[in-house]
Curated annotation (Swiss-Prot):
Listed EC numbers: 4.2.1.11
Function in brief: Catalyzes the reversible conversion of 2-phosphoglycerate (2-PG) into phosphoenolpyruvate (PEP). It is essential for the degradation of carbohydrates via glycolysis.
The organism of origin for this protein: Bradyrhizobium diazoefficiens (strain JCM 10833 / BCRC 13528 / IAM 13628 / NBRC 14792 / USDA 110)
GO biological process, one term: glycolytic process
Protein name: Enolase
Active site location: 205 (proton donor), 337 (proton acceptor)
Top-level taxonomy: Bacteria, Pseudomonadati, Pseudomonadota, Alphaproteobacteria, Hyphomicrobiales
Recorded superkingdom: Bacteria
Family: Belongs to the enolase family.
Pathway field: Carbohydrate degradation; glycolysis; pyruvate from D-glyceraldehyde 3-phosphate: step 4/5
Binding-site residues for (2R)-2-phosphoglycerate, renumbered to this chain: 163, 337, 366-367, 388
Length: 427
């Protein structure tokens, strides 16, 4: 009854107006699973390959008809008739079929679309929510949202070198309450930026992109908005940064073009330590560049006991890179992006490895998103306790938050909220 009888790939648009892959998996019993694949702007060099057509006459070269062709052709032929509940087997067949170390032949976007659609079809066939199907009966932890309210770096056209300034409502008693905290700060920040004469248009992830000269200036606005919204910074709401520092690491130095400053590896680590000392910053993502291994070790030794240090470009959701990092003592947390690795099975393996080593994990969106809310279910399924899915604007972001509200309601009294315990720096 749960045999795969059809796989249908199609080209759809993401939140930036670029093509991406959507896949439907149809089962013998009539159940259907649908998944759409996200796409990043600041991508790690070690990520699985997103296959684009490269035909400049169509979508400026960003079409995905080759990946869709792989879904409808080779991948369907290899999986037709298989039991959809055999997720690990299905994912391994696709990995072997691709035959490259980084999924570059068929495309991680093709493989991931099928992988996630299979899990959704299986859940629908069993009449189970996806978080329950993937996570079993222990899946009940609602994640703390890391809400990206000020954007800089490659996500914005402003001088701020860091990519994201986030708020985390750790003092809330439930996910729904935490979301309200975030929304109230978001609207307060908007009016404060307006008062100061700043543009309040939103960026790719729904955050504001004001023309501010430095990280300090952005942090002052965030602190002010938290207080003016009636919350206490450091207890109700804490702050997170995504430096995306690979983007401004040049010739062994960190070049802050917006600030007009250049910092050495040691100076970069000390600068971040100074920010942590002056603001209630409890999590920093990609504080060092993806290949600056010495810098990562230095930063971890310096502030790893009091701050969550999240490896995104450093680990790219890859168990091999994560294992190396754990062994060397680099970072203490991993960002989980399903499209960095390209299958559900490998994604779950990365979360499991992190948790076994005492590292935290953060489920994450990409800057190019769709209305697909799979990562909301995966955050609950893995009990990871944290999710990063943008700001409180744009339906491609709120789709994930709204799904988490539904899950929390469905779990009822069983639901737990990550809160301060989700971040080891606060526990």
């Amino acid at each position: 009854m749960t045999a795969i009888i059809d796989i249908i790939g199609r080209e759809i648009l993401d939140s930036r107006g670029n093509p991406t892959v959507e896949v439907d998996v149809v089962l013998e019993d009539g159940a259907l699973g649908r998944a759409a694949v996200p796409s990043g702007a600041s991508t790690g060099a070690h990520e699985a390959v997103e296959l684009r057509d490269g035909d400049k006459a169509r979508y400026l070269g960003k079409g995905v008809t080759k990946a869709v062709g792989a879904v409808n052709g080779e991948i369907f032929e290899a999986l037709s008739g298989l039991d959809v509940e055999q997720q690990a087997q299905i994912d391994q067949i696709m990995i072997d079929l691709d035959g490259t170390p980084n999924k570059s032949r068929l495309g991680a976007n093709a493989i991931l679309g099928v992988s996630l659609a299979c899990a959704k079809a299986a859940a629908n066939s069993l009449d189970m929510p996806l978080y329950r199907y993937v996570g079993g009966t222990s899946a009940r932890l609602l994640p703390v949202p890391m809400m990206n309210i000020i954007n800089g770096g490659v996500h914005a056209d402003n001088p701020i070198d860091f990519q994201e300034f986030m708020i985390l409502p750790v003092g809330a008693s439930s996910f729904a309450e935490g979301l309200r905290y975030g929304a109230e700060v978001f609207h307060t920040l908007k009016s404060e930026l307006k008062k100061a004469g700043h543009n309040t248009n939103v960026g790719d992830e729904g955050g504001f992109a004001p023309n501010l000269p430095s990280a300090d200036a952005a942090l002052e606005f965030v602190m002010n908005a938290i207080g003016k919204a009636g919350f206490k910074a450091g207890s109700d709401i804490v702050i997170g940064l995504d430096c995306a520092s690979t983007e401004f690491f040049k010739d062994g130095k960190y070049v802050y073009e917006g600030e007009g400053k250049t910092r050495s590896i040691s100076e970069q680590a000390k600068y971040l330590a100074d920010l942590v000392a002056r603001y209630p910053i409890v999590t920093i993502e990609d504080g060092m560049s993806e290949d600056d291994m010495d810098g990562w070790k230095e930063l971890t030794d310096l502030i790893g006991k009091k701050c969550q240090l999240v490896g995104d470009d450093l680990f790219v959701t890859n168990v091999k890179r994560l294992a190396e990092g754990i062994k060397a003592g680099r970072a203490n947390s991993i960002l989980i992006k399903v499209n960095q690795i390209g299958t559900l099975t490998e994604t779950l393996a990365a979360v499991e490895m992190a948790h076994k080593a005492g590292y935290t994990s953060v489920m994450s969106h990409r800057s190019g998103e769709t209305e697909d809310s799979t990562i909301a279910d995966l955050a609950v399924a893995t009990n990871c306790g944290q999710i990063k899915t943008g700001s409180l604007a744009r339906s491609d972001r709120t789709a994930k938050y709204n799904q988490l509200l539904r899950i929390e309601q469905q779990l009822g009294k069983q639901a737990l909220y990550g809160g301060k315990a989700a971040l080891k720096a606060l526990a």
